Amino acid sequence: MFKPTYLARLQACCNKFELADLLQIKVTFLTNVLYRIRPENQYKKFTIKKKSGGEREIFAPDEKLKDIQQRLSELLYICQEEIWAKNNIKQNVSHGFEKNKTIITNAERHRDKNIVFNIDIENFFPSFNFGRVRGYFIANQNFKLHPNVATIIAQIACLDGSLPQGSPCSPVITNLICRILDFRLSKLAVTYGCSYSRYADDITFSTNKKNIPDALVSNEKENEPGKILVEEIHRAGFTLNHNKNRVSRCTSRQQVTGLTVNKKINVSREYIKNTRAMAHSLYFEGSYTLIEKDGKHRKGTLSELEGRFAFIDMLDKYNNVEAKKNARPERYVVKGFGLDFKQRLNSREKAYSKFLYYKNFYGNEQITILTEGKTDPVYLKCAIDSLFLDYPQLVREEKNTKNRVLKVNLFKTNDKKNIFSICLVELQTIRGFSDDMVYFVKRMKNSLLKIQ
C-alpha cells in the first residue's frame, strides 16, 4: 500500500487539528501555547558577543514552545529532503544550519583561489517577517499549503512579526526561503566563472581569474559589490551590510567564515598562539583571561578553552584525511608536525592532550574515576544511582526534579578523549589497556610536574 510522504501529509492539512496530529501533539496543547499563553510571552532574551564587535540578540523559547518548534523543524527538514529527492536537487551551496554541513565544508569551496569576495546580509533573521514566512508556504510551488496551516506555521515560528534567532525552526525556514537566492547567485557565479556558497548570512564568491568580474565587484579597492549582484540581493528581499564587504587576493590572508583558505583550511596562527597562551596561564596561574572585541577583559572558562582546542583538532583531522586522499597531499599537511599519530602525537595534539589531562586529572572539581572497560562507567553509574541513599558523597538528588546527579566524573574511554591518545601524552607504542593504565600511573608524577 502506498504511504504518503510527509510533504503530502502536510499539504493535506487544512486546520490546526490536522497539523497538530501531524506534529504528534494534542490540539489543546497547541492552542494553549499559541493563543492563550502566546509566543511573545514564552521567550528569554540574552546577548552574545559578535566576533566583529557588538552584540547579537538570542531569543530562547521556553520548553513548551520549543517542543512544538523542534517538531516543526524536523517536519520541514524531512519535507526539504523529499523535495530535493523528487527534483534531483544536490544541495552544495548552502552550508549553514544544514545536516552534514559545517563552516569547513563552506570554506572548502573557496580553498586555494586567486580572489575571494565576502559579503554579508544585513539583519538576516529580522528580514523574514510574518507575512513573508506565511506567504512562502502558500505560494511556493513545492509546498502550496492551505492558508490556515501556513498561518499557524508562521505563528509557531515568529516572534514580534519576524523569525527570532534562537528558535529551533528559524534555520530551516530561512534556508527554504533563501533557496531562490542561492539559485540566482549560483547561476550568476557560474556565468562569470566563479564559485559561490552561503553560510546563513555570510555569502562568498571566489575565482581563479586574474580579476573578479565587474558584475560581482565594481570597485575592488573600495570592496564595492557590482550592480548586478546588488540587484539580485535586493530582488530576493535582502540588503547588504557594506561594512563587511571584503575582497582578498591570494597574496594576502583569505578568510571564509573565520577560516583561512589560502592553501588549506586552517585557523590563523594568532588563534593557535593565543589558545596555547591561555592554556599556559591556566596551568601556572590557575586562570586565564579572554579579551572581548570592546577591549574588556573577563575570566575564561574550561569549556571555552576546550572548545578552542577541539576546534583546532577538528581542522587537523580534516586536513589529515584530505592529505591521504588528495593527489597533492603537501597542500594539506601542517608543516613541521608528524602525522604518524598512531604512535606519536603532533604538537597541536600534545597541547590538546595536556589541556585534557589538566581538566580531568588536575583542575577537576570532582573526583575522576578511570575504568578498564568501555561499559564499566555505565555499570558504575547504575550502581551508584540505585544506592544513592547509602552513598550521599557520590550522588545527590535534585529537590525539584528528583533527578540524581553524580558527584564524581566517570572518565569515558572512547573517541578522541580516550586514555590511549590523550592522557598518555607521549605514547610511543600501542599496547593493551591494562599496560596503558600502568603506564599512565607511572607517568602521572611527571605529567603533573608539567602543569604545576
What do the PLM-derived regions correspond to, one by one?
Residues 335-452:
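Acidic, divalent-metal-binding catalytic cores of TOPRIM
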